[in-house]
């Protein structure tokens, strides 16, 4: 069996003609919100469209959804998934008097107040903060960050129920409507603001496939979101964004109830010391891998490509190392939303992923995942893991999975086969959200069901084989592994077969 070190000594240094297994998420903004550009992004490697609900009107987001669907008409290809990223509960400062900025020096003492009379009258003496309980949760000596850490303050005194006395730790400007972070302080904000609830209802109505849920702190936050999505949104996948210390502390419980995870390093790097984000990223990805929950790595991955046609070497290493850590997906934000080189950014990410994936020693990784997964596993997971074992023993070229719900291909992906996973499904939603799982290539089988179950299975397998051959994954005579159910419906994928194309 090839070790990781042995693998690295024979690593190809070019992308070659391999199939990329890591999915790419791109935020859609003014530079990319039209069908033709979306087609170009998809051809470059985009799998999931992200809408950032911190910005834009419903009319704008509606246009993104419509343009994404038009791009599929122009370029059928594989299904495109659409994600709604919530704004999330947040703390912000008020409006400055006259809407002007007020400079402050280091060691400047001032007041933070929750009194509404200062909401539109902030200056260098008093700053309004819209979190009523801030005086209850914070204590003397704690740090407060404003404007993503551009300004730092130390709490000198909790004066009363509405007032904090603080001291600036650096020079800066007091500006309107800036975000506030309370690192090391547990806050009791609700899981969803009223805006978030309305946004989720918009997502349900318009058929989004997944929700990226911001600032998740507890497992109950996830259950609250599921409740708001309701019966009509029961098939929407929830991807929790871990971006504060509470989320990190409660991650094990959160992981049990979420569908997938995003390591959102932007706010996380404000809430905890930046060097610690490295360890947190690796830990959360590893735990997600073991749980078989897809995991996304996000924020500033190719930030310089917002304005430059080429990335920094550090950015390329960041993308590659996230994939080596075990990320199923990597994400672009401003690079595709407002950047000057959105297609270049996706192409760069795709090329980097291809090379990074070649550095993975897949069989030792499979052994680790199998050995560390608690037993007994479900029947579906046992079959999924056995399919991957069969791939290594038979040197199979592909795993073809016939699935209704999309659960089986996700569990096959967990065990990281060194070949593509071809998903054949009649469920378009399952095809779309399967992009969250590394190595899954979804195809929607549109032919009507055949009354004879065995014949129907054979027809779908034939379809999967044809797609694998079209992709160049295998040729006639090659060995493949297949998983299918013994009868119709969800939850019956327990039949494994090794065959030749």
Swiss-Prot record:
Catalyses which reaction(s): pyruvate + ATP = phosphoenolpyruvate + ADP + H(+)
Cofactor: Mg(2+); K(+)
Protein residues bound to K(+): 52, 54, 85-86
Pfam families membership: PK, PK_C
UniProt subunit comment: Homotetramer.
Binding site residues for Mg(2+): 243, 267
Organism classification: Eukaryota, Fungi, Dikarya, Ascomycota, Saccharomycotina
Entry's EC annotation: 2.7.1.40
Family: Belongs to the pyruvate kinase family.
Superkingdom of the source species: Eukaryota
Binding annotation for ATP: 52-55, 92, 178
Pathway membership, UniProt: Carbohydrate degradation; glycolysis; pyruvate from D-glyceraldehyde 3-phosphate: step 5/5
Site feature: Transition state stabilizer: 241
GO terms of molecular function: ATP binding; kinase activity; magnesium ion binding; potassium ion binding; pyruvate kinase activity
Residues reported to bind substrate: 50, 266-267, 299
Organism: Naumovozyma castellii (Yeast)
This protein's UniProt keywords: ATP-binding, Glycolysis, Kinase, Magnesium, Metal-binding, Nucleotide-binding, Potassium, Pyruvate, Transferase
Official protein name in the record: Pyruvate kinase
InterPro entries registered for this protein in UniProt: Pyr_Knase, Pyrv/PenolPyrv_kinase-like_dom, Pyrv_kinase-like_dom_sf, Pyrv_Knase-like_insert_dom_sf, Pyrv_Knase_AS, Pyrv_Knase_brl, Pyrv_Knase_C, Pyrv_Knase_C_sf
GO cellular component, one term: cytoplasm
């Amino acid at each position: 069996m090839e070790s990781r070190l042995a693998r690295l000594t024979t690593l190809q240094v070019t992308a070659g003609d391999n199939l990329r297994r890591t999915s790419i998420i791109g935020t859609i903004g003014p530079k990319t919100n039209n069908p033709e550009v979306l087609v170009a992004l998809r051809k470059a490697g985009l799998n999931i469209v992200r809408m950032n609900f911190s910005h834009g009107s419903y009319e704008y987001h509606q246009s993104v959804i419509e343009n994404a669907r038009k791009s599929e008409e122009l370029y059928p290809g594989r299904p495109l998934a659409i994600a709604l990223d919530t704004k999330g509960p947040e703390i912000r400062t008020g409006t400055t008097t006259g809407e002007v900025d007020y400079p402050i020096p280091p060691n400047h003492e001032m007041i933070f107040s929750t009194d509404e009379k200062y909401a539109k009258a902030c200056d260098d003496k008093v700053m309004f903060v819209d979190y009523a309980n801030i005086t209850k949760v914070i204590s003397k000596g704690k740090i407060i960050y404003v404007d993503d850490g551009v300004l730092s303050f130390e709490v000198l005194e909790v004066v009363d129920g509405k007032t904090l006395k603080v001291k600036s730790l650096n020079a800066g400007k007091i500006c309107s409507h800036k975000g506030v972070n309370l690192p090391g302080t547990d806050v009791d904000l609700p899981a969803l603001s009223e805006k978030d609830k309305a946004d989720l209802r918009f997502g349900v109505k318009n058929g989004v496939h997944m929700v990226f849920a911001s600032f998740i702190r507890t497992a109950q936050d996830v259950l609250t979101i599921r409740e708001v999505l309701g019966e009509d949104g029961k098939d929407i996948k929830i991807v929790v964004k871990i971006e504060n210390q509470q989320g990190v502390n409660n991650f094990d419980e959160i992981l049990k109830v979420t569908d997938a995870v995003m390591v959102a390093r932007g706010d996380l790097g404000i809430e905890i010391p930046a060097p610690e984000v490295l360890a947190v990223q690796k830990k959360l990805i590893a735990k997600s891998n073991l749980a078989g929950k897809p995991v996304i790595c996000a924020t500033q991955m190719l930030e310089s490509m917002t304005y430059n046609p080429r990335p920094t070497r550090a950015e390329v290493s960041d993308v590659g190392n996230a994939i080596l850590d075990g990320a199923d997906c990597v994400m672009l934000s401003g690079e595709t939303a407002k950047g000057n080189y959105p297609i270049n950014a996706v192409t760069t990410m795709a090329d980097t992923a291809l090379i990074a994936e070649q550095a993975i020693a897949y069989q030792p990784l499979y052994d680790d995942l199998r050995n560390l997964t608690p037993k007994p596993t479900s029947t579906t997971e046992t079959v999924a893991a056995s399919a991957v074992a069969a791939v290594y023993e038979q040197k199979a070229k592909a795993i073809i999975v016939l699935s209704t719900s999309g659960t089986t291909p996700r569990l096959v992906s967990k065990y990281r086969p060194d070949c593509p996973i071809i998903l054949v499904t009649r469920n378009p939603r399952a095809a779309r959200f399967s992009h969250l799982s590394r190595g899954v290539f979804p195809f929607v089988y549109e032919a009507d069901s055949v009354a004879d179950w065995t014949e129907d299975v054979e027809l779908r397998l034939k379809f999967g084989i044809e797609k694998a051959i079209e992709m160049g994954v295998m040729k006639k005579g090659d060995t493949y592994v297949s998983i299918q159910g013994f009868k119709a419906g969800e939850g019956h994928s327990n039949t494994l077969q090794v065959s030749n194309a």
